[in-house]
Amino acid sequence: MTKNRTEVADIDRSLYDFTYGEEGFERLDAGITPDIVREISAKKDEPQWMLDLRLKSLEIFNRFPDPTWGPSIEGLDMDNIVTYVKPNTDQKHDWESVPDDIKNTFERLGIPDAERSYLAGVGAQYDSELVYHNMQDTASKMGIVYSGIEEALHDPQWEPLIHEKFMTLIPPTDHKFAALHGAVWSGGSFVYVPKGTKLDFPLQSYFRLNAKGAGQFEHTLIIVEDDADLHFIEGCSAPKYNVANLHAGAVELFVGKRAHLRYSTIENWSKNMYNLNTKRARVDEDGDIEWISGSFGSHVGYLYPMSVLNGRRARSSFTGITFAGAGQNLDTGCKVVLNAPETSATVETKGISKSGGIQTFRSSIVATPKAEGSKATVSCQSLMLDDQSRSDTIPAMDISAKNVDIGHEATIGRIGDDKVFYLMSRGISEEEARTMIVNGFANPVSKELPLEYAVEMNNLIKLEMEGAIG
């Protein structure tokens, strides 16, 4: 039975809600079939093993049921989703060579300025393909590899490593949309940081889904070898449409012994988006993974970055904020598997809901029998801005080890009238006062972001708060 397309109320996000059309773009047919999967693979001239993985993933996708634990995705009909849209250009390494319509999009989003100001490298994806990729000479001279993952897949030096790692942390059997990703993935980044290499400036990838009724399925694969250090930033946005769009990307992070990786994300999808993203890290002995996450936008969201701590004294920290407004049901959280002695994890999240938005936080801490002497703490704070909104906290703990210390605390509250009245007594309007309080609530996340992204997050909160009074 054919489902109706999702209708979503218009929301003013003028910085992101613009499009220059699709002149010269190539769209495959909507839906997902073996022929479509083969066509995607053929366009990319992939090795046979990748085509085999795609077709096997499609079989798994067709067998698996929709998830039952989170928000309804009944309005998402894959028969209406276009899984591949090629923009009107191949990948460029010179910004001036990018077509004007795409270049104007990223310039409005501030990507070139960010690259000039503080980034060691940047990749920009438009719909299904990377359109721009560049890395500073200082990073390349250090032996760091930062390229499109498809470019690396066709490089004899890196194809064996990609074959070894690709979709091993997130196998197609993990869940239905991991299988979908395995079948139709396109675009994304490959990063390799050699042993002992420490990059002082971040790398960034920005993903823009421009096409109406389409999906974006980029794959990010990052390998940080022993004693190396990297900060990677991911940004996402899309214009709004009155039909469903889908994002089902995947992120696989391999962190070596005594290595450190910070992965920062600001997701600002349009509110017709189904964001069903999967992110996972494996951390070896004395390694450290930091997740910094800001989730704004999307109609329905499932997002639970996961850390598997496989080496003694491996560490994971997660700091995240989710803002659910009108018409949004965002189910977010974090998972940690303590799978070696003396591992440790901290999870700190902030959730904000307004105008009937629903925000759910899920945490899962698993201590395997190998995790003796490990520790984990989970803290969740939620702020509801009106009587129509909802916030839930759903913790899960599975402890099979001795001598572990695992704790969880959660608080749900509202903005105190006394705080608002105090600020108003200083000449601040009620709306500005509430915005200031919400920004203060979000500060533990924003202070961990690069300045430009912290400003963007505060502006997003301000935009969401406009008209919140009355």
Explain the meaning of each model-derived region:
Residues 62-71, 441-451:
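Short arginine-rich
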Residues 2-250, 254, 260:
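Short, low-to-moderate order helix/coil transition modules at the start of elongated helical scaffolds
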